[in-house]
Amino acid sequence: MAQQLSLFGSPEPEETPVTPAPAAAPAQPEPAPEPAAAYASVILDIPTRALSEPFAYGIPEPLANEAQIGSTVLVHFGNRAAAGYIVDIAPELSDLQGNDALDPARIKPVEAILSKPLFTAEAARIAHWMSREYVATLSECLRLFLPPGGSPRVVKGDGGVWTVERPAVKPIQNHWVMLTPEGFDYTPPKTAVRQRQLIEVLQCGPVTTRDLNLLYNSMSATIKALEKRGVVIVEERRAWRGCSEQTTLSSASGKAPVALTNGQQQALAQIERARLDAHGDVVLVDGVTGSGKTEVYLSAIERVLAAGRSACVLVPEISLTAQTVGRFRSRFGETVAVFHSRLSAGERLDQWDMVASGAARVVVGARSALFCPLGDLGLIIIDEEHETSYKQGSSPRYHAREVAAEMARRYRCPLVLGSATPSAEALDRCRRGMYNGATWTRVEMPERPGHAVLPTVRIADLRREFAHGSRSMFSKPLMEGLERVVERREKAVLLHNRRGFAPFLMCRECGCVPTCNHCSTALTYHERTHTLQCHTCGSSWRVQPYPAPTSRCPKCGSRYLAKMGLGTQQIEDALHQMLAEDVAIIRMDADSTRGKDAHKKLLEQFDAADCAVLLGTQMIAKGLDFPEVTLVGVVNADFALKLPDFRAGERAYDLLEQVAGRAGRGDRPGEVIIQTYLPEDPVIRAVAEHDRSIFTDYDLDQRRDALYPPFVRLVNILVWSANRDDAQDYIGRIAKLLKRRWHAAAPDFLRAGSAVPQVLGPASCVIERAKDRYRLHLLVKSPVGYHVSDDIDACLKEVGSVRGVSVSVDVDAYDLM
């Protein structure tokens, strides 16, 4: 079997059956195991909480040269075959950590090597740290470091046969034709027209056989003839898909400015000190919108590359990558790789391989780019560090900022966090000065380069608008602002953080609001498709609301099933009716950006327009740099303010301050108009006065009194099941065990001068039912600095698993819904 599977990677069937060797007859003694040349710690690719540590396997002599840390291997575990990943190798079993008491005679052998090394020993150690920190399985943490398309896996097929499944994504090789030194002097016969054509083309540089065949139908025979004569050579080179992410955005230039501002110089100097100290320290670049944080990043990376090291840059939104990658490639050329989920599987694989091979030394992308195999990592940058998109929504539920800080400590490189609205956690750590052994330093950048100034902010009080008889979605100040933009042929950005046409439908007779059959959420109406859609599970239903003659309430049968509230599609229709036909109205939300490169195409369309309005959800609020934008309007600032979440105010402030920063980034002054029914709210006042402390002082007082982060660590334990009683019983047992554990340890906490962890709940989630599963959760508030994850992991192992019941642990939770 080992011999057969060692051929993995050669062109053979996609699945290879794995048949365990037949057991020996009971009357015959088992043969002595083949002596192991070495021993390996193997993480099994079996996602279960019970397998929380590596297992020891022997490496037979025939595989000794192939087996390396990072290799995927085939092993047997119990009565099944399994894939695993080697994370350590030692000549003796006793040298493997935690395996010194094992009997070598009982150690099973590695059956086959399924892949070359896919990760480093340091990556394996970081995965182990993540597994402990986020109460996740080792295998799912390690998979983050594997190439896109995955590694070989062992799956159970029909008839109970285990098979090795290969990655479906394969590299592509291009064949390049080029002239030899002698070929430049070669003169083909006059009758050899195609030879002359080929040589003329190749004198400009190498060309792929594919392009030659497209230009001249078929050139294969001509190429072979000239190759035999030594005129040309054909060279096989790896094709790098995903490198063509070019953009026409005018703001994507990476040209260095004439001079840095004082704030930029101070930030760059602090980053350089952290780089030279090599302690893994953190620098928070706290710069107002438009203050030139990206130029600080570019200058810092230049120094890192000059020192022979590499850099990783994270951005929060896919819509930002086109601009960011454009600026970085303009400065650093093709040494920049891009990595995000909108690339195809083949493009992601090639970008990953570019990094692994050293062809790319800078990676720009979403949070997953953090796990690309950069050699000698010298700098990590997280732009817009306050963004919640850096928190992974599925297991392992890591936060990119925390993993990056751990990586910076291990690689002894600086971590740079940039934001105009830093998170409460980042600001708190800078106030403390030290966190987890690293120094946290905040550098302010309070001014914009050149003559640019922060925009003026006007508050449109919708209560007064209503009192004066206005029923429009646009206040008088916002309508006048849009008219001025059109007159001056400028551009505007409108934010409305609700996609669809209307947030919900409601029966005007009985008050019924149609909800999803599978979730406890109201359905959103989409005018273009005449559907009600669930934004939780994706289900949809055809509907004709009032005044359509077929409109019917699902509860009482009334035809007055009316559209309620505003969505981006409805605002788009209103703008088309209000503004001149030559004004481009461009909508950016989750519905309009589903296709490949949709973000980039819409932004390029906005950039190229003479006069335009960019309407969208939160994806347009940060990072976009268009000097022609002189007006930003917020259609309704109140949606995010009163959500049942202690972070609601922080998120609302971040969103409003960030979108306000899109205005006035060029030579022309900017104006921001915020429509609200709550003008006295601290969030609205802070944005209007450009004074963050108005909000943060109020918000921190509220969090301190209620014991919320950053004063504690918050863990959300979520349980879901199709049977509510099963979910209730399971989470109740978890809560009971945790309370008992910490009650018994209370004297130890008090002697150490620490608060005792608290358990709140269990209770039903705000979204009580999703995808036909009932959801309950409990919250744990833990003292900062106490590793609560170990306690939770121990309790979950004690409770064990229950059929039909699922559990997840979200450490440093952001989503409590």
What annotation goes with each model-predicted range?
Residues F332, L579-E581, R741-A752, G800:
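Short helix-capping segments at alpha-helix termini
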Residues Q728-L760:
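Short amphipathic alpha-helix segments
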Residues S693-I694, L700-D701, L738-K739, A744, ...:
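Surface-exposed amphipathic alpha-helical segments in non-transmembrane regions
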Residues L750-S754, Q758-K771, S808-M817:
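Short proline/glycine- and acidic-rich turn/helix-capping motifs at secondary-structure junctions
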